[in-house]
Structure formats: C-alpha cells, structure tokens
Amino acid sequence: MDKKNFVVDNNPYDLGKDVYKKHHDVRDVHPILLTLILELDRVCRKNNIPYALSFGSALGIVNYGGFIPWDDDMDVAIDYFDVPRLVDALKNDLGEEFAFDCYEDNKRFNVLIPTFKIRYKNSYIKEKYWYTLPNRCKNSDGIFIDIVALMGIPEDPKEHYKLIKYSKRRMVPYVALDAFLRIHPYGMKKKLKDLERKVAEEYRDSPMVSQTVIIPFQD
C-alpha cells in the first residue's frame, strides 16, 4: 500500500454530518477544491497574474502526488504587488458560482492570514476553531482556498527581530478584540495593513519574504 492510501485508510478525517444526516470526510472536499483552483488558474492566466501552490498544497504535490489526505483547503501564493490586479481580475472574471473575500474589497474581512479567500458558493463548511479570527464577511462559510501575498522583509537579524516585535504588539490587541470580545477593530486592521504596505515597499527587493510581517520565513 502506498503512503497516501495508508494515511487515508487509517485516518478518515470525519467532517461530521450534513443537513441530510450524511457523513462526510475530507476526501469529499477535494473535488470542490480542485474546481476552485482551476477557476483561479483560469482567471490568473487570463490576466497574466503569476501564482504558485504553497505551504501544505505544495507539500501535498511532493509527498502525495496531490492533496495532503487530511487537508481541507488549498494554499496559493502571489506577489504582494499583484494584489490590486488580482482584486480587479476576480471582480471582473470570477465565475458566478464562486465568490472572494479580501480586505481590499471588503473592510469586514478581518482575517490577518490569508490575504484572500475564494469560496464555492454552493457549499457550506464551518471552521471549527472560530476563535482564530473567523471571516466576518457575509455568507463566508463555503469551502474555500487561501491566497497569501508574499512580501519582502529585512535580511538583517536585528532589524528582522525589531519588525516582528513591533508587529506583534499591534497584532495581539487586534486578535483579542476580534476573537474573544467579538469586536471588529477596523482602525487597528487599517494600521496593520498600512504597516504591511510600508514594509513591502521598503524591502521589495529583499530575498527574505513573509506571508505577513509577523510570520517570516526565508525564500
């Protein structure tokens, strides 16, 4: 038995019952995720926007030849400076059965990571850990893929550490208000996005990149 089948057969990853009392596991989500990524691919190709599979989705291709067996979403990365173009492309070209959420289009999008969520409208799935900043956009509980925008960050370790420390001081009260008090602090989110933009512009040519200014990794 190959690795993928062994993992799947020994870990059903039950998603619970639907409204018709039928049990589902994560494998039932994968065909919809494939539909979503193919739609994103179509839109990006039409508008000449580069993208790449990232994080768990890239790992799944390498280790399993497809999805990680327990993965219930897909991860995609784009360049930070392509965000405005992707917003316009999704507004103009995304198919009617899909929807997208992002801060640049809807200030109710309170999520810090990812930058975008693209959803399949004719679906419903509720993220279990709602306290980790649930998407507050209307009708946002469909099956989705995540898109992160990669941005440059400082190479110098001291500057890097200072940025992380500063960012976390801004992030912690935002998360506390949104996740636990259920208050959406619009002003705090704007300041975080302004910081993101400032860092991205200052370190545009840096070989160090991050999906936000608070979770860095080396490219």
Which positions does each model-derived feature cover?
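Juxtamembrane luminal stem/stalk of type II transmembrane Golgi/ER carbohydrate-processing enzymes
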Residues: D2-Y20
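Short, His- and charge-rich active-site/binding loops that engage polyanionic ligands
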Residues: I164-R169
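Conserved catalytic core of two-metal-ion nucleotidyltransferases
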Residues: N11-Y13, K21-N47, L90-E155, P173-D219
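Short acidic/polar alpha-helix capping motifs at helix-coil junctions
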Residues: D2-V8, R27-V29, L53
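A short secondary-structure junction signal
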Residues: P157-L163
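Active-site nucleotide-donor binding segment shared across nucleotidyl transfer reactions
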Residues: D41-M74, I78, V83-P84
